[in-house]
């Protein structure tokens, strides 16, 4: 990679960091978290050099502010993408079952997921309390849902959370 390419890459993640600080789309708690790392370029780079991507195990990442972190913004983006797909398929009336584990932010992420799907006219079945993956799997089949979402990072360390779609 040339020096010029490195500078361009650096500009991209710094530009995204600045966008999150200045945009009215992000709440004060998020902005304060980002302000606390303003002098740590490596941390800024790690949080913004890429967006979380779906892998074989869904989305997984450290909880925190940034495009490369699990937070209400990345969960919202993933959920809206799934909603768009469900609407394209015309299966919104079948619904989506949603479950979560005991990790930090799991309940909040699952509630947000249900609200976004509902706002798109998609029926949801949100468990009232934490449930294991096999119970979600059973619910998807029993209720004949078009999809199931599990908020969990499985075996990853406690600072992680995840978003799995079935």
Short names for language-model regions:
Residues 18-20, 91-166:
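Ferredoxin-reductase
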Residues 3-113:
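An N-terminal, well-structured beta->alpha segment
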Residues 1-4, 119:
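Low-complexity, intrinsically disordered short peptide segments enriched in small/polar/basic residues
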């Amino acid at each position: 990679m040339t020096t010029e390419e490195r500078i361009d890459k650096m500009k991209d993640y710094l530009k995204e960091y600045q966008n999150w600080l200045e945009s009215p789309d992000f709440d004060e708690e998020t902005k304060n978290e980002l302000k606390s790392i303003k002098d740590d370029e490596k941390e800024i780079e790690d949080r913004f050099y890429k967006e979380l991507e779906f892998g074989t195990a869904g989305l997984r990442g450290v909880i925190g502010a940034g495009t490369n972190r699990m937070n209400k913004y990345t969960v919202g983006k993933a959920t809206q993408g799934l909603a768009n797909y469900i609407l394209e398929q015309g299966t919104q009336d079948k619904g989506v079952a949603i479950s979560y584990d005991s990790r930090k932010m799991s309940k909040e992420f699952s509630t947000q997921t249900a609200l976004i799907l509902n706002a798109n006219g998609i029926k949801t079945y949100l468990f009232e309390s934490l449930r294991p993956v096999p119970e979600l799997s059973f619910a998807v089949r029993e209720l004949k849902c078009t999809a199931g979402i599990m908020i969990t990072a499985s075996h990853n360390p406690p600072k992680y959370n995840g978003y799995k779609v079935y």
